[in-house]
Amino acid sequence: MTTDD
């Protein structure tokens, strides 16, 4: 899982 803000 990847999270980009």
Swiss-Prot record:
Enzymatic reactions: (8S)-8-amino-7-oxononanoate + S-adenosyl-L-methionine = S-adenosyl-4-methylsulfanyl-2-oxobutanoate + (7R,8S)-7,8-diammoniononanoate
Any GO BP annotation: biotin biosynthetic process
EC supergroup of this enzyme: transferase
GO cellular component terms given for this protein: cytoplasm
Keyword Transferase: yes
Signal peptide: none
Keyword Transferase applies: yes
EC numbers: 2.6.1.62
Subunit structure: Homodimer.
Role played: Catalyzes the transfer of the alpha-amino group from S-adenosyl-L-methionine (SAM) to 7-keto-8-aminopelargonic acid (KAPA) to form 7,8-diaminopelargonic acid (DAPA). It is the only aminotransferase known to utilize SAM as an amino donor.
Protein name: Adenosylmethionine-8-amino-7-oxononanoate aminotransferase
Source lineage: Bacteria, Pseudomonadati, Pseudomonadota, Gammaproteobacteria, Enterobacterales
